[in-house]
Every structure is written in C-alpha cells, then in structure tokens.
C-alpha cells in the first residue's frame, strides 16, 4: 500500500483540499479519493486555530470510520477536544476556542452529530499506526524506539506532546528534547507537532508539521517514495512559532 501522510492541518481545510488535489486526489464525491488507491494518513491536530475545524472532523471521520480508506493518529489538540466533548474541565485556549466557537454556532442537533463523530473517531483510533509490515509509523509528536508497541501513560504523553523536559520557554511552551537524533531504527517515523519551516529528516524520522496554521505550509509525505509536497498557507506568518529544535 502507498500512503500520503498529512502534517498538522489545524482547521486549514482549503490548504488540505489544495494539497490532496496536488497529490492526485479527486474530490468529485466530496471526499479525496486517489485513482491509484493511495491512502491518506493524518498525524493528528486536525482542528484548532484554523477556520474550518469542524469540516476537517467531518472529512476525517468519513474517510477513517465510514469509508475505512484512511488512518488517523490523534494529537494533543485532538486529546483536549475529546476531553471537552466528554464534559471534562478543560481550559478553552491555545486554539481550542476557535473550534468551540464553530461548535457553539451550530444547532443542538448539529452539535450532537459532530460531537458523536469526533468521539467516535478518537475512540476508534490507536495512539499511533504501525503500517507497511512494521516499516512505517505514523504518530503525532514522535515515538522513542523502545516505546514502539506500547501504549501506556508514559508512551501516550510522549506521542502526544513529544520528549518534554518539564521546563518552559519564556512564552510558556514546553522545552522538548530532540529525540529523533537518538533514533536508530529502520522503520520510518512520520510525525508533526513541532512546527518547522521545512520538512525535517533526521535518521529514519521526518517531521512534516510545516506550520500551515502559522502561515507556513501544509506538507504531505508520499510513502514509500519519501517525497514531500507542500502548499502555501493562506494565513499570516507567525515567525516565533518556528522555534529551532533544541
């Protein structure tokens, strides 16, 4: 099977549609379908900050759950939205407020439908995907070599948030270790979470979060070709979001 793996979309539906079209997907049915049966995979964070988070939920639910033609690994924003929909006490900030505003603008019936779809998508999706006979791992923030095959709390924290040190940058964002430098496995790990100006290949890992929602690009990785394709963001560029990997 051949895959096209999408970086963090964050509600940037138009960029997603443009990128998938560029990758050869046909939207005539209202969904991106590839004539050669390539399948999409998502590294998570499909919502928050961008203008069309609910549209992304609809599309990804349809592809992953109903059609079973795509793969989705949840990100930290997905986890927080899931907890919001469960009625947990979460802080509506850091992008969640845009998704909640879209949600609150719906009728109660429409709210019930989108809430059900996202909970369904989240609960039916694994923490990360191991594909192509263990040669490809799709996850949100990466995964350490010795964590592959596990899904305990420690692994969940790593996969959703990265290799956090517990320290904070001046803007409040967490300091993360560069785990990819220590990866020696043969399987390709494709992930996002930390915005980079260009796709970042280190050992057999690649970060494809090129900051679409921060005015960068939306990037897709063609696997097994290992070719990246990007489309520019329509949103304003926010340079401070593209921090050097420490």
From Swiss-Prot:
Recorded hits in CDD domains, A to Z, give: MPP_Prp_like
Keywords carried by this UniProt record: GTP-binding, Hydrolase, Nickel, Nucleotide-binding
Name the enzyme group at the top EC level.
hydrolase
Q: Which cofactor does it need?
A: Ni(2+)
TM segments?
none
Concerning Pfam families, the annotation shows: Metallophos
Q: What is its EC number?
A: 3.6.1.17
Record flagged with keyword Magnesium: no
Instruction: List the InterPro entries.
Output: Ap4A_hydrolase, Bis(5'-nucleosyl)-tetraP_PrpE, Calcineurin-like_PHP_ApaH, Metallo-depent_PP-like, MPP_PrpE-like, Ser/Thr-sp_prot-phosphatase
Choose one Gene Ontology CC annotation of this protein and give it: cytoplasm
Instruction: Supply the Gene3D superfamilies for this chain.
Output: 3.60.21.10
A molecular function GO annotation:
phosphatase activity
Q: What role does this protein play?
A: Asymmetrically hydrolyzes Ap4p to yield AMP and ATP.
HAMAP family reported in the protein's UniProt record: PrpE (MF_01443)
- Entry similarity comment: Belongs to the PrpE family.
Q: Which PANTHER family match?
A: BIS(5'-NUCLEOSYL)-TETRAPHOSPHATASE PRPE [ASYMMETRICAL], METALLOPHOSPHOESTERASE
Q: What is this protein called?
A: Bis(5'-nucleosyl)-tetraphosphatase PrpE [asymmetrical]
**Annotated source species:** Bacillus cytotoxicus (strain DSM 22905 / CIP 110041 / 391-98 / NVH 391-98)
What is the primary gene name for this protein? prpE
């Amino acid at each position: 099977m051949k895959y096209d793996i999408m970086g963090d979309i964050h509600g940037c539906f138009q960029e997603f549609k443009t990128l998938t079209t560029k990758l050869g997907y046909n939207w005539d049915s209202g969904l991106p379908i590839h004539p050669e049966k390539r399948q999409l995979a998502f590294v998570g964070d499909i919502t928050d900050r961008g203008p069309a988070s609910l549209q992304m939920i609809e599309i990804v639910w349809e592809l992953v759950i109903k059609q079973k033609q795509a793969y989705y690994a949840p990100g930290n924003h997905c986890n927080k939205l899931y907890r919001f929909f469960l009625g947990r006490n979460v802080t509506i900030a850091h992008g969640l407020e845009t998704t909640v505003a879209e949600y609150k603008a719906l009728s109660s019936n429409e709210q019930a439908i989108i809430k059900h779809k996202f909970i369904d998508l989240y609960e039916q999706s694994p923490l990360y995907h191991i594909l192509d006979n263990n040669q490809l791992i799709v996850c949100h923030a990466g995964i350490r070599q010795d964590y592959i095959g596990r899904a305990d709390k420690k692994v969940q924290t790593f996969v959703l948030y990265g290799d956090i040190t517990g320290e904070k940058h001046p803007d409040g964002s967490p300091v993360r270790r560069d785990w990819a430098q220590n990866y020696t496995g043969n399987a390709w790990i494709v992930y996002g979470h930390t915005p980079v100006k260009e796709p970042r290949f280190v050992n057999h890992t690649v970060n494809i979060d090129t900051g679409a929602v921060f005015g960068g690009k939306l990037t897709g990785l063609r696997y097994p070709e290992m070719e990246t394709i990007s489309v520019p963001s329509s949103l304003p560029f926010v340079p401070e979001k593209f921090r050097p990997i420490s």
